[in-house]
Amino acid sequence: MAGSLSEIKAKIISTEKTSKITSAMRMVSSAKLVKSEQAARDFQIYASKIRQITTDLLKSDLTTGSDNPMLVSRPVKKTGYIVITSDKGLVGGYNSKILKSIMDMIQEYHAAGDYEIISIGSIGSDFFKARGMNVAFELRGLADQPSFDQVGRIISQSVGMFVNEIFDELYVCYNHHVNSLTSQVRVQRMLPISDLVAEEAAEEGVTGFELEPNRHVILEQLLPQFTESLIYGAIIDAKTAEHAAGMTAMQTATDNAKHVINDLTIQYNRARQAAITQEITEIVAGANALE
């Protein structure tokens, strides 16, 4: 019985230590989430403005025609997917949701292998490579608050593959941050961008920008920046969802640890009570034997 009590006590102490670790990790993820949400809000100001300007320029350029490859829809022979996952685990179902979605899409539409994957995040890279899938580029070790300098190269490479007709359309697959408890898998078509902006161009009025030397020349310079901003925004969004998932996972782990501690404490008290009762019974039995 003494051995049983010591074993239960050791489990309680071990679980308490684990609970402290997961609680600390939850607080770290919470702090990262606050920073990411602020970064997303700040970036949205820039993203909204560049979208407005691009939409305005496209209104006239789409009607006059354009040979810019980023605007041209061509027969789809191969598709590119930028897939954003985390570099580490302990984020609940964050990675499994996005990986399941991309696998379902590939199995349904690309049985012949007519796709290329640009992987951001070690979890996704290892997952795809273990299955012998087509990974064109990868980026590991993404910062908690990723700067454009860190991701700019892989974004430019992705856009360049479309422009050079290595693939004919480009999607970004990531977890969209809704709130601290919820994220949604989002598969967003980035290129060609004519469809992406056409609806807004049809609905909104002309903003009346006066640009030099002319709208067409400015648009040629602006389109790559606009597309890169969309992809970068998706990366920030995904990173925010990752921090939220990490915070939720660690909160769940902490709560579960507390439940385990409570159960073990009850088990310990019952075992201790049984041991005391047994000792009293043995003492009484011994006293009766002496009479």
Curated annotation (Swiss-Prot):
Keywords noted in UniProt: ATP synthesis, Cell membrane, CF(1), Hydrogen ion transport, Ion transport, Membrane, Transport
GO MF terms, alphabetically ordered: ATP binding; proton-transporting ATP synthase activity, rotational mechanism
Keyword Transport: yes
Alphabetical GO biological process terms: proton motive force-driven plasma membrane ATP synthesis
Keyword check for Cytoplasm: no
Pfam families associated with the record: ATP-synt
Chief localisation class: membrane
A GO-annotated cellular component: proton-transporting ATP synthase complex
Membrane topology: Peripheral membrane protein
Purpose: Produces ATP from ADP in the presence of a proton gradient across the membrane. The gamma chain is believed to be important in regulating ATPase activity and the flow of protons through the CF(0) complex.
Name used for this protein in its record: ATP synthase gamma chain
Organism: Streptococcus equi subsp. equi (strain 4047)
Biological classification of the source: Bacteria, Bacillati, Bacillota, Bacilli, Lactobacillales
Gene that produces this protein: atpG
